[in-house]
Swiss-Prot record:
Enzyme Commission identifier(s): 3.6.5.-
Chain sites annotated for binding Mg(2+): S172, T192
All residue ranges annotated as the Obg domain in the record: 1-158
Region (Disordered): 121-143
Gene Ontology cellular component list: cytoplasm
Gene: obg
Family according to the record: Belongs to the TRAFAC class OBG-HflX-like GTPase superfamily. OBG GTPase family.
Keywords: Cytoplasm, GTP-binding, Hydrolase, Magnesium, Metal-binding, Nucleotide-binding
Cited NCBIfam families: Obg_CgtA (TIGR02729), PRK12297.1 (NF008955), PRK12299.1 (NF008956), small_GTP (TIGR00231)
Protein name: GTPase Obg
Organism: Chloroherpeton thalassium (strain ATCC 35110 / GB-78)
HAMAP family: GTPase_Obg (MF_01454)
Length: 333
């Protein structure tokens, strides 16, 4: 099961109390204050883990609390600070405050770690409050309270290529052919009910990631079909591969509808590099009337996942576009 959103509650630890204490030593009848400071409460962090792929674990554990710091002690002993809590999430997770909607973290690379709830500071012991007029203070500083908040987690797939097409366009077949991914495949719409990731080995030490996005239908930008739930995953891809079956009734109309749904959802998607992939070419080889539409001058690659025709060309084209996209990103940064 692919879980792409979750809600959790986090509570950082309170600080330890400062100590009120006085020296008790032989031959020192009126020892001064020696109350130690309290320890710091544990903070809570989120950390991106490349070994995680879903937010499923958060269905079973929704509350995360860090321990408080230990209280200060006499003889100027500082209380021990509490350990921090690290919450591991998949790469690509966005973290927001549930009440305010404030973005707290966008975890885009493995090992990235962000503080989401800070532990309370330890209270100062009475040793800090002695003055010439009050040499025996009988008070200490209160401990700080650890932050608490409700958190929204949202996972958006990180992939180089996003396969976009109507249900039953052949996306799952293609990704299973060019990568090691094994998505469920059947001859009916909406077989893919969750995004699949496949790693395509292009050459030695060279590879790229393809996301098989569940099928879009007309009205998806308004929530129809699988709708908005999966359109958002396209936002994180570098390149869009518009997959259209060559045997569809009106190839150009299908292309126009897909582009329009992307535009309605987010116009910036139409600015991404993209190519058109005509799939199932083996079904129209003997159709003399078949013509490849212009597709507004887009690069078109004709393939058949069944016969293997055009697959190497497709990988070559995708690899080249990815490299061009990476170079553009580097020049901007």
């Amino acid at each position: 099961m692919f879980i792409d959103s979750a809600k959790i509650y986090v509570k950082a630890g309170d600080g330890g109390k400062g100590c009120v204490s006085f020296r008790h030593e032989k031959f020192v009848p009126k020892g001064g204050p020696d109350g130690g400071d309290g320890g710091t409460g544990g903070s809570i962090f989120v950390k991106a883990d490349a070994n995680l792929a879903t937010l499923l674990d958060f269905r079973y554990q929704r509350h995360y609390k860090a321990e408080r710091g230990e209280h200060g002690q006499g003889s100027r002993k500082t209380g021990r600070s509490a350990k921090d809590v690290i919450i591991k999430v998949p790469v690509g997770t966005i973290v927001k405050d549930s009440e305010t909607g404030e973005p707290l973290a966008d975890l885009v690379y493995a090992g990235q770690e962000v503080l989401i709830a800070k532990g309370g500071h330890g209270g100062k012991g009475n040793q800090h409050f002695a003055t010439p007029t009050n040499r025996a203070p009988r008070y200490s500083e209160p401990a700080g309270v650890g932050e608490e908040r409700n958190i929204d987690l949202e996972l958006k797939l990180l992939a180089d290529i996003g396969l976009v097409g109507f249900p039953n366009a052949g996306k799952s077949t293609l990704i299973s052919t060019i990568s090691a991914a094994r998505p469920k495949i059947a001859n009916y719409p909406f077989t893919t009910l969750e995004p699949n990731l496949g790693i395509v080995r292009y050459a030695e030490y060279q590879s790229f990631v393809v996301a098989d996005i569940p099928g879009i239908i007309e009205g998806a930008s308004e929530g129809k079909g699988l709708g908005l739930k999966f359109l958002k995953h396209i936002e994180r891809t570098k390149v869009l591969a518009i997959l259209i079956p060559a045997d569809t009734e009106d190839v150009q109309a299908e292309y126009d509808t897909l582009i329009e749904e992307l535009r309605k959802f987010d116009e910036s998607l139409c600015l991404k590099p993209r190519i058109v992939v005509l799939s199932k070419m083996d079904l129209v080889l003997e159709d003399a009337s078949f013509e490849v539409p212009a597709f507004e001058g887009e690069k078109v690659v004709q393939i058949s996942s069944v016969t293997g025709t055009g697959l190497q060309e497709l990988k070559d084209v995708l690899w080249r576009i990815i490299q061009e996209s990476n170079q553009q990103e580097e020049s901007i940064t």
